[in-house]
């Protein structure tokens, strides 16, 4: 059902956020974690979200609308060390505003690069979400780069570090935009948001 998602808006200012009247699923994570590639894999559209090898290239909130039923939201990545403090503060302020005030936000998907695992900047973001009672799902990206045993080790390590997190929604899904692994499971989780809307629980507790 997500194959008809199309880019409809790129927003750099909180006052310009669109109102689609549909549930939104937002993708967050460190710079270069593979958000755009994963959105393209989920929507089966290789040219949908612009993919860049340069970290921090997404400086705006990008919206992809699926036939007026669901919107996927690509949030700017955090943790890019080469971004100026002023620039980083500007777009992270936009992300914070979106996460705290967006009534249409139904699910936040936090992406973790399986090759490097959870970093302190990820844990800081998770703590921020926990403190503000924002529900989120964890998705491991780029699992095609790992052997099966390596992936299991990474998954166990991640599960151990987030044990006790109250806002975390399960299951933790391993994905690969390149091989397609885990994409079907992720699409299933995302699609459930349409069925749950508007009677389902909001992303904020």
From Swiss-Prot:
Keywords: Cell cycle, Cell division, GTP-binding, Magnesium, Metal-binding, Nucleotide-binding, Septation. GO terms for molecular function: GTP binding; metal ion binding. GO terms for biological process: division septum assembly. Its cofactor is Mg(2+). It comes from the Bacteria. It holds the Pfam family MMR_HSR1. SUPFAM superfamilies: P-loop containing nucleoside triphosphate hydrolases. Gene3D superfamilies: P-loop containing nucleotide triphosphate hydrolases (3.40.50.300). Mg(2+) binds at residues 36, 58. GTP binds at residues 29-36, 56-60, 74-77, 141-144, 172-177. Residues 21-196 form the EngB-type G domain. Belongs to the TRAFAC class TrmE-Era-EngA-EngB-Septin-like GTPase superfamily. EngB GTPase family. Necessary for normal cell division and for the maintenance of normal septation. HAMAP family: GTPase_EngB. This is Probable GTP-binding protein EngB. The lineage of its organism: Bacteria, Pseudomonadati, Pseudomonadota, Alphaproteobacteria, Rickettsiales. The gene is engB.
């Amino acid at each position: 059902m997500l194959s008809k998602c199309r880019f409809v808006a790129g927003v750099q200012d909180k006052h310009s956020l669109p109102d689609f009247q549909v549930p939104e699923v937002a993708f967050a994570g460190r710079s270069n974690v593979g958000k755009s590639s994963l959105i393209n894999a989920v929507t089966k559209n290789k040219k949908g979200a612009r993919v860049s090898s340069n970290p921090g290239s997404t400086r705006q909130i990008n919206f992809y609308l699926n036939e007026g039923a669901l919107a996927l939201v690509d949030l700017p990545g955090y943790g890019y060390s080469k971004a100026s403090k002023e620039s980083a503060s500007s777009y992270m302020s936009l992300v914070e505003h979106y996460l705290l005030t967006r009534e249409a936000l139904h699910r936040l998907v936090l992406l973790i690069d399986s090759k490097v695992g959870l970093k302190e900047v990820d844990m800081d973001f998770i703590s921020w979400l926990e403190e503000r009672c924002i529900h989120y799902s964890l998705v491991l990206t780029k699992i095609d780069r790992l052997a099966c045993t390596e992936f299991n080790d990474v998954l166990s390590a991640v599960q151990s570090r987030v044990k006790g997190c109250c806002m975390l929604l399960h299951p933790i899904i391993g994905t690969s935009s390149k091989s397609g692994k885990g994409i079907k499971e992720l699409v299933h989780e995302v699609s459930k948001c349409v069925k749950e809307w508007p009677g389902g629980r909001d992303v904020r507790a």
